[in-house]
């Protein structure tokens, strides 16, 4: 199975993965990277995630499926020079950027791990959703779901809820801090670290699980950003 959104699959088909080394930051349980390495006939996949249980599961799956993938339990900021200029392709998917307050620092690490000329494909929630309230927010109005309640530029919040990656079921978690980012923050973080933007696609359908009730109503809900390291 290919565990990507339809539009992401279409973009990845334009990227030559055969014999290449693919890296994924905030890979969760590894299913996306495993499926891409297998379907794209890549030579190797490397995934990073801070959650040790998810990484253990991913490594077990890689062994079970006999795929050339390794997964490391590490804070992205602590990724060492073993991975300097190792990746031909980098993928970043939904739910990664919100864990990082400083995207310039995040993309500095990402760029360090990319070979010159390497490709990056980022599939994330659209930054315009930063302004919307979701069910559970005090501001949420089921009659006016597209009403903007928050600043596009500043929105940091803490929570105790999460969503299972495989089942989309909600659960109670330890308190965490979540950071939202404007499109300019994301693009600048890449450009400041030698990544040239080569494509941007925007979509009016949700990939986060929080805004599907306003799918296809003209509001930007998700995006794919592509780049190359100089």
Predicted ranges, named:
Residues 1-20, 35:
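Conserved alpha-helix/loop element of class I SAM-dependent methyltransferases that forms part
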Residues 104-119:
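A short glycine-rich, Lys/Arg-flanked "PGG" loop and its adjoining helix->strand segment in the class I
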Residues 185-230:
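C-terminal lobe and adjacent flexible extensions of AdoMet/dcAdoMet transferase-like proteins
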Residues 21-79:
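Class I SAM-dependent methyltransferase SAM/SAH-binding core
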Residues 81-90:
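A short acidic, Gly/Pro-enriched loop at the edge of an enzyme's catalytic core
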Residues 98-99:
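A short His-aromatic
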Residues 92-94, 123:
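Residues lining the SAM
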Residues 117, 122-188:
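SAM-dependent methyltransferase
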